[in-house]
Amino acid sequence: LGWEISLTTTAVLAMSSTISKLGWGSGAAPKLISTIVVVGLVVVAGIFGYDLIMRCQQVITIVTGVITVGFFILGWGHIDFDAIGRIPSGGLPAMLGCCFFVMTGFGLGWVNIAADYSRYLPRKSSNSGIVFWTTFGASIANVLLIFYGLLLAGSNAKLAENVGNDPIGAMASILPIWYLIPYTIVAVLGLMSGSIMDNYSNGLALLSFGVKLPRTAAAGLTAALTVAGVVYVTFFSDTFIGPFQGFLTTLGVPMAVWAGMFVTDVIVRKKDYSTPDLYDPNGRYGKWNVKSFVILAVGTILGWGLVVNTAANWLTWQGYLLFLIGGKDGSWASANLGVIVALLVGLFGALAFQRGDIAKQEADLPASETADAIEAK
């Protein structure tokens, strides 16, 4: 839900910025129109289901790639390597903070969506193939875009500041007018495609919790929450980057713990889960995994104590353990160490306390079939 709000807000800001630049409106009107259009399309596509989403994704991916190459070419003239060379080097805490923030945004922030993609993969898909192609496909665009964005931000301090308020609109400001419209359309569609998948995923998540709602109603409920978040960030927040950073660091910590436990489960568990037992409160897996909840709580408490976000006033309570490494004003405060600490707590906590439980669960289960065996059938 947080990612749906973030992506939808970015799309709304991009569209409203373009409307204003083209002289088609001013004040709150462009934001209001953009909110109605973007949220409406996200809701419609999310309600109609997976097939429509996949059709949208395929087309948007191809067109976005072409438009992005054009952006690289047209924006190259705005890169000033002399200005970049004059930027002083950052310290180790700043570098780690940047790395962990990117890790949270492009890795940990999306780990829970894996089920939505993997459940549509053929059973014959190999584990190594899934890991490699998912990692490669998810990383290559991010590496290129982040590197290019750093060059642009280092060349123009004003542009770097504007990106924090309106990421897509700021990037569009360096483009010629004739390229502005196709660039904005494709950027908005790309952001919306992620929001569409998130909206669909949110609806399924509600249903999996036992909420008695039709899938369309569940998608509509998450859309209403998205509208509330978009309206807050668009109309009442001074910047986009403040709430966005707050969202990533606050939710990234418990997600890191969960991801660590999940990785341990993948490493240690040698057999497939028993599907009937997963749906049986009295089955081999039980109704509650108390150890997992304890590990999650401990990792989250430690992680939140080692992150700080001065851009969001509602998160000033975080960082209560930073006094151990120089305080909230020290150089290590912005290192986002809480994220990696949370990940390690989840990983090693599960290794230490759940290995025996997994062995008991697998005691009388048949061996898992390999991808080759499944394909042979």
Give the residues covered by each predicted segment.
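Hydrophobic transmembrane alpha-helices that form the core helical bundles
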Residues: L1-W24, M192-S208
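Transmembrane helix-loop boundary segments of multi-pass membrane transporters
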Residues: S17-L32, Y50-T61, G169-I177, P182, ...
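Transmembrane alpha-helical segments of multi-pass small-molecule transport proteins
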Residues: K21-F48, I62-I73, C99-A114, I185-V188, ...
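Hydrophobic, small-residue-rich membrane helices and short re-entrant helix-turn-helix hairpins
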Residues: F48-T61, N112-L144, L159-A170, D198-T216, ...
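Hydrophobic, membrane-embedded alpha-helices of multi-pass small-molecule transporters
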Residues: F72-H78, P88-L152, I174-N199, A259, ...
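A conserved active-site cap/scaffold subdomain adjacent to cofactor or substrate pockets
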Residues: I177-G220, A224, A228
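C-terminal catalytic subdomain
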Residues: P214-L278, Y285-S292, V339-L347, R355, ...
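C-terminal membrane-solvent junction of multi-pass transporters and transport-like membrane proteins
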Residues: A259-F348, A363, A367
